Amino acid sequence: MQACCFARSEGGSTKRRRAQVGTRVFVLVLATAMASGHACAQSLIDTLSQAYSYNPQLDAERARLRATDEDVARANSGYRPNVFGSADISRERTNISPNTGTNGSNTPKGYAVQLVQPVFRGFRTTNAVNAAEASVRAGREQLRLVEQDVLLSAVQAYGDVVRDQAIVRLRENNLKFLSTELQATRDRFAVGEVTRTDVAQAEARRSLAVSDLELAKANIKTSRGVYEQIVGNPPQRLVEAKPDTRLVPGSLDEAIGIGTQENPQIVGALYSEQASRFQVDQIRGELLPEAQLEATYSDRYDGSSQIDRVESASILGRLNVPIYPDGGEVYARVRQAKHTHVSLIQQIEQARSVVKADVIRNWSQLQAFKAQSVADRAQIDANQTALNGVREEEKVGQRTLLEVLNAQQELLLSQVQLETTKRNVLVASYAVVASIGRLSVSEVGAASNVYVPEAHLDEVRNKWWGLDITHDDGRSEHMDAWGARIEREPVK
C-alpha cells in the first residue's frame, strides 16, 4: 500500500474554513504514507495541477477578468430606468408688523419620486454592451496567456529539479568512484607500484569532485525554491517526465498554422480591435438625438397657505438633439477613438509576427535538442567503453592513472550533459505547445476542477443590484475595501 501527500498552501477565508477538515485528512494520509514506508512519487501532471490551482498569478488574473465582467453589467444599465427620491422638511416662523393676523409658524414638508426611462440613446447602450462583451473575450484570452505562462514555468521548474536531482546523484557516484580510486592509489603507493605524483593527481580529482557536488547541491536548493514559488509547495520525489508527443504538431508548417489561429495573443488582439470598433460607434452616438420618458410623483404639505396638501403626478417625453455639444469635444473623442482603433489593427499584425517567430524558434530548438539527445547518448556509450578500456590497460601498465581519471571525467561530463539535454527537450516540447496556444490544463489533463470564466459573466450580466462579489471558487462575499487584508497560510 502506498499513499501520496502533497502539502499545499492556501490563502483567503474559504481556504481557512477548510483547515480543520484538511488537517484531519492530511494527518490520516501522512500516517498511511509513513506506515507504508515509501516516498511519494510526484509526476509532471501532479505539478501542473497544483500550479493551476494555487498559483497567485493565476488567481490575480481570474479576479481581474471578473472585474472586466462587470463592464457588461455597467453597459446593460443603460437599458434600465433611473429612480430618484427626495424629501425635505423645514420650520418657518413669520412676524409681520403691524400684525395682520398672519403671524405664526409652520412646518412645510414633502417628498417626490422620479423615474427616468431611456428610450433612445443614439445606439450608445448597444455599442457599449458589444464593446464590453468583446473586452471580456479579450480578457479571457489574457487569462489563457497567463495560464500558459504559469504552466510552462511549472514545466521548467519541474525539469530543473529533476535535472539537478540526477546531477547530484551523478556527482555523488563520481565522488565515490574517485574516493575508491584514491584509496587504491594510496595502497599501491605504499607498496611502490605508483609514485607520489599519481597520489596527488587522485587527491586533486577527488577535491574537485567534492566541490562539484557542493555546487550541485546548491543548484538543486535553488531549483526547489523556484519550484515552490511557482507551484505553491515543495517538490516531493519527482519522477522523470517524457514530452507529451500527442500535443506537439507533426510539422513546422502545421504548428505555424495552428498558432496563427489559436494563440491567445492573436485571438486577444482580434477581440480588442473589435471592442475598439464598438467604442468608436458608442462615442459617435453622443451626436445623435436622445429620447427618454420621465415620470414624477410628489406630495407636499404646507400649513402656511389655504391649501394644506398638494399631490401631483406627471409623465412626459423628452427629446434632446445635440447641435454643437461640448464645444467640439465629442468630435475630438471620436477621432481619438478611431486612431486607437487603427493602432489595435496594427497590434494584430504585430501579434501574428511575434507568434510566428516564437513557433519557429521553439520548434527549431526542440529539433536541435532532440538531435543533441541522440548525440549525448552515443557519447556516453563511447566514453563508457573508453573508460573500461583505459582502466584495463592501466592495470597492465599501458595507461597512466591520469588517463583513467580523464576518462572518468569525460564520462561524467557527458552524463551531466545528457541530463541537461533531457530537461531542454521536455521544456522545448511544451514551449512549442504554448506557442501554438494549446498549453492548458484541459489539454494536458492536469486538473479535474477547471475554472470556467463564463459562469461569472452569466451571473452578473443582468444583475440589477447587489454589493457582494463572487470568488473563483463560487463563494459569495461582502468585502469592504477598508476591511480587506491579505492572508495566506504558511507553506507546510
What residues fall within each predicted segment?
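N-terminal secretory signal peptides that target proteins for export/translocation
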Residues: 1-21
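Acidic, low-complexity, intrinsically disordered peripheral segments
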Residues: 8, 15, 419-492
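Periplasmic alpha-helical coiled-coil/stalk elements that build and connect Gram-negative outer-membrane
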Residues: 15-16, 149-261, 272, 362-365, ...
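Bacterial Sec-pathway N-terminal export signals of envelope proteins
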Residues: 39-86, 119, 235-273, 323, ...
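Short flexible linkers and secondary-structure junctions
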Residues: 40-160, 164, 168, 178-179, ...
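Sec/SRP-type N-terminal targeting helices
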Residues: 59-63, 76-80, 84, 105, ...
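Outer-membrane beta-barrel translocator domains and adjoining extracellular loop/strand segments
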Residues: 95-102, 127, 240-242, 288, ...
